[in-house]
């Protein structure tokens, strides 16, 4: 019995060790201009985590589009948060105070099962952008 429990625990540890943590920086200025997440597109495996890192002040990360069955997140202002992504699909997130400046990003987890819906909702979201109107569409174009 003890051998079975130990074997099960080792198996779970090996599975957990396979999950990666990726980082997304919250920036005032980056390679794509003002008020950006870097990278703006990230492809990860199911079970991986994404940590939103505060580099510059006055930013947060809030999921606005998630796959069916997934839980959205909303970080506080200037908060570094780590989000575990267990549901396959496309996630779109924004910085609440800079959403109008198209401070948005996309995470693809495994297969993009909700891509059509994510593109449709993102097109509506982009109507509220006052600058960088194609930034979110460019990030979504990287989903494969």
Residue spans for each PLM region:
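Sec-dependent signal peptide recognition
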Residues: 2-8
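N-terminal signal peptide c-region/cleavage motif recognized by signal peptidases
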Residues: 14-17
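Extracytoplasmic copper-binding redox domains, predominantly the cupredoxin/blue-copper superfamily
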Residues: 19-144
């Amino acid at each position: 019995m003890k051998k079975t429990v130990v074997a099960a625990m080792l198996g779970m540890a090996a599975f957990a060790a396979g999950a990666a943590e990726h980082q997304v920086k919250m920036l005032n200025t980056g390679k794509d201009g003002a008020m950006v997440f870097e990278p703006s597109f990230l492809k990860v495996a199911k079970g991986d985590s994404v940590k939103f890192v505060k580099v510059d002040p006055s930013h947060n990360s809030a999921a606005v589009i998630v796959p069916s069955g997934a839980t959205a997140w909303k970080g506080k202002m200037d908060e570094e948060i780590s989000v575990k992504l267990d549901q396959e699909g496309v996630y779109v997130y924004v910085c609440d105070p800079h959403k109008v400046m198209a401070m948005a990003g996309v995470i693809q987890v495994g297969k993009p099962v909700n891509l059509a819906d994510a593109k449709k909702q993102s097109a509506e979201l982009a109507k509220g952008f006052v600058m960088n109107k194609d930034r979110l569409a460019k990030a979504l174009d990287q989903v494969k």
